[in-house]
């Protein structure tokens, strides 16, 4: 296990790790297999590399636009970095691509806003999300803008990340240790279904350009969805 901030320093050295962590928190909730589909939302997120690759291939075959991986890199950016789907779901490789995209956005923003480091950084967040310096600042009724979400995540993701918890004495030294809960297996090894009428309660936030489908020919999988994006203080990447 590698703490996220350590991974970010190794794989995305040109971006402050706390900044990268804030983006990842909003984009994928630190899920390396996350897929966001433009115009829809997956019924649930893939829970394994094989399932993520199969889902991406299925979406591509059906002509969908989507972003993938821990930093939600858009599928059309993969050829630019010589990346396959399998590589894009590798946290380090995905962070490297995401950091390059953000760095390019920031370099262009600081030229337009000389001496305004934080202003340029926020403009770069918008660029990362929407492909321009304004789209990420737009809000929807009852929802903050993408840039506001990223900035708000900074306070959360900069807290210390605990890899191994502190040992605590139990009242009874002979207390039984709870057996680990056995995870349910995916209903099948096919692609995850896509919902063309997404609700606002599912899926991580994704960008429109670097952005989030139920395939009508299939039925939704019955497997429980993986945990959401509440992975903050104890974030680790396997």
Curated annotation (Swiss-Prot):
<dbReference type="Pfam" id="PF01464">
    <property type="entry name" value="SLT"/>
</dbReference>
<dbReference type="InterPro" id="IPR008258">
    <property type="entry name" value="Transglycosylase_SLT_dom_1"/>
</dbReference>
<keyword id="KW-0843">Virulence</keyword>
<protein>
    <recommendedName>
        <fullName>Type IV secretion system protein virB1</fullName>
    </recommendedName>
</protein>
<comment type="similarity">
    <text>Belongs to the virb1 family.</text>
</comment>
<dbReference type="InterPro" id="IPR023346">
    <property type="entry name" value="Lysozyme-like_dom_sf"/>
</dbReference>
<feature type="region of interest" description="Disordered">
    <location>
        <begin position="197"/>
        <end position="238"/>
    </location>
</feature>
């Amino acid at each position: 296990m590698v703490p996220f901030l350590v991974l970010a320093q190794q794989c995305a050295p040109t971006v402050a790790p706390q900044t990268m962590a804030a983006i990842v928190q909003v984009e994928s909730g630190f899920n390396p297999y996350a897929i966001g589909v433009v115009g829809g939302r997956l019924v649930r997120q893939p829970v394994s590399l094989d399932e993520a690759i199969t889902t991406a291939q299925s979406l591509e075959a059906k002509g969908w636009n989507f972003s993938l991986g821990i930093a939600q890199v858009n599928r059309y950016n993969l050829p630019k970095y010589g990346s396959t789907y399998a590589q894009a779901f590798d946290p380090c490789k995905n962070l490297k691509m995401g950091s390059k995209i953000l760095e390019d956005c920031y370099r262009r923003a600081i030229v337009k806003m000389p001496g305004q480091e934080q202003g340029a950084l926020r403009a770069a967040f918008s660029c990362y999300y929407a492909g321009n310096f304004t789209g990420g600042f737009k809000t929807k009724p009852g929802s903050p803008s993408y840039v506001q979400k990223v900035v708000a995540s900074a306070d959360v993701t900069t807290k210390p990340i605990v890899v191994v918890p502190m040992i605590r004495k139990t009242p009874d030294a002979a207390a039984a240790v709870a057996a680990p809960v056995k995870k349910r297996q995916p209903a099948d090894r096919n692609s995850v279904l896509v919902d063309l009428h997404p609700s606002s309660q599912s899926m991580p936030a994704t960008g429109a350009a670097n952005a989030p489908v139920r395939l009508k020919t299939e039925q939704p999988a019955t497997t429980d969805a993986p945990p959401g994006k509440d992975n903050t203080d104890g974030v680790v990447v396997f």
